[in-house]
Amino acid sequence: MKFSKFHSLGNDFLVVDLDEVAETGDFKGLAQEICERHTGVGADGLLVISVKDPGRGEATFRIFNADGSEAEISGNGIRCAAAYLFSQQRVEGRTVRFATASGERECDFIERVQNRYTIRIDLGAPRLSSQDIPFDDGQVRERIIDYPLTINKKVYPVTVVSMGNPHCAVFVDRFPNRIDWLATGAEIESHPFFPNRTNVEFIRVHNREEIEVLFWERGVGETMSSGSGSTAAAVASILKGLTDRKVRVKTSMGPLLVEWEGDTVRQTGPAEFVFVGSFLLK
């Protein structure tokens, strides 16, 4: 099976184009096998895409985490999938529209420098109600801002949003040590109030235009960056009145730009080609 590897700020993915390989059917098992970093190729996730209309730039997108679970959406994953299609000239024009489990997402090609593509994604409107996220503490809530979530007898004021997938934002004055925040991220991910589990972001606000984020990704664990996580962190910062509506998000591998205008949140960032390869299916 042929694949291409891309990454966006260290968040790495293996792209499988269904128009070039025979569909395996068991993508969950394949993701677990191929994403394993010691016995497989190694990646945070597997992207399965197919072009439906090259002239209109229409394609389908599915993402499977390294643990085999299927996610609704991934900002960095969408960007990597778009970079693949642009690099292979699989679509005409400078825009690709992906049909995802969370609805249509539009990606615009901005520029290319060698193997690095800059792409802007329209992620639509954030979902803020407890039913839409989903978040279930037994009450219906229009917004979840500074909710007192108890983890191991410690209360964390969290802000919860969905960018097509659930995110729990934890604001800190300084980042906890790595062992502590990884343990907390794992506990929050599987908290019973999140019926579909959740992604977790630990956020430091530098000023009204910049935040810094650490990421715990559902089904993966620690990641160097996260597109939807960066967007959710920016949205949470805006909801709390801590930043303006145009936010630079610092990750451990570089920045992403998030802009919230009206009902639309857009994110601009890089996606970089790494290599192509083939994987022997068992």
Please annotate each region the language model reported.
Residues M1-A22, I121, G138-V161:
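N-terminal, positively charged, Ser/Thr/Ala/Gly-biased leader segments
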Residues M1-R116, C168-K282:
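A glycine-rich beta-to-alpha transition motif near the start of alpha/beta enzyme domains, typified by
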Residues N115-L123:
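Short, solvent-exposed secondary-structure boundary/capping segments
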Residues A125-R127, M163-H167, A271:
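Glycine-rich beta-alpha junction loops
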Residues R127-Q131, V276:
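Short, charged/polar, Gly/Pro-enriched secondary-structure boundary elements
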Residues F135-I144, S190-F194:
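Short, conserved active-site entrance elements at the starts or edges of catalytic domains
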Residues P157-V158, P166-A169:
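Selected transmembrane alpha-helices and immediately adjacent juxtamembrane segments
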Residues V161-M163, N177:
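Membrane-interfacial helix-loop segments of redox and metal-homeostasis proteins
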